[in-house]
Amino acid sequence: MSVRLPLGQISSSKLNVLSQENKLHQGKRSVRPQLNTPSNSPSTESFNNSEISLASVLNTQTSSSQFYSTPPQALHDVKERINNELTEKNSKLTDENILRLRSRVQLAYYKYRTKQVHLKFSEIVSRKKQSANKIRKPENDRKSRKLAGLNPAIEATSRTNNNNNGTSNLAVCSQQHIQCITPEKRYPAKPYASTSAISSGYTPVSVKAAKSLLQMFSTGA
């Protein structure tokens, strides 16, 4: 069996090294070595009395170290691929998309010109339809009157008669595409003189009776 030796006889032990340093320099204070710092990086205490700056040493270390970066050829390929994708997206603009964009621009300009920016497209269309219906109503009335055979002059006379009398005094008579307007004839419900009185030669005394007789003779002729 192997006999276990004490730590003092192992030359490579760190405790043995420390014990030997303490024995050699008992009167002086020993400096503890920096065990946590890596071997390739110098300690900061070594730069206190030296003229070499810490920044220069760091720069030399970073320049000597190797960084794993992508080669320039791969970057160039990636850039070309991105540019090709962008050009393909731009080339996919069809005529339909162009028409949509054009219509949007025209609608925006129309809103700005008519001061209707706050309105939606549906509201603008509904207002446009309402104004068009208001304009079409008088045109439709004129067309219906033209189809009925009414001339503008006859329309004017009918309007004046309606305004004067308060009621429609016009009666339209149609006979084989011939249409005429005749005023209403108002006969007295009860004539002031009978036919027997007229035939006997009786003359009425009142002025109203005389006027009614004149109207009867004029209408009968």
Curated annotation (Swiss-Prot):
Protein family (similarity comment): Belongs to the WHI5/NRM1 family.
Q: Which Pfam families match?
A: Whi5
In which domain of life is the source organism classified? Eukaryota
Q: What is this protein called?
A: Transcription factor NRM1
- Subcellular location(s) of the protein: Cytoplasm; Nucleus
Renumbered to this chain, region (Disordered) spans 21-48
| A GO term from the CC aspect | cytoplasm
Q: Does the keyword Repressor apply?
A: yes
Alphabetical keyword list? Cytoplasm, Nucleus, Repressor, Transcription, Transcription regulation
Q: What is its main location?
A: cytoplasm
Show the InterPro entries listed in the entry: TF_Nrm1/Whi5
Instruction: State the function annotated in the UniProt record.
Output: Negative regulatory component of the MBF complex involved in cell-cycle-dependent transcription.
Subunit and interaction comment: Component of the MBF complex.
Q: Does the keyword NAD apply?
A: no
Bias type Polar residues, positions: 33-48
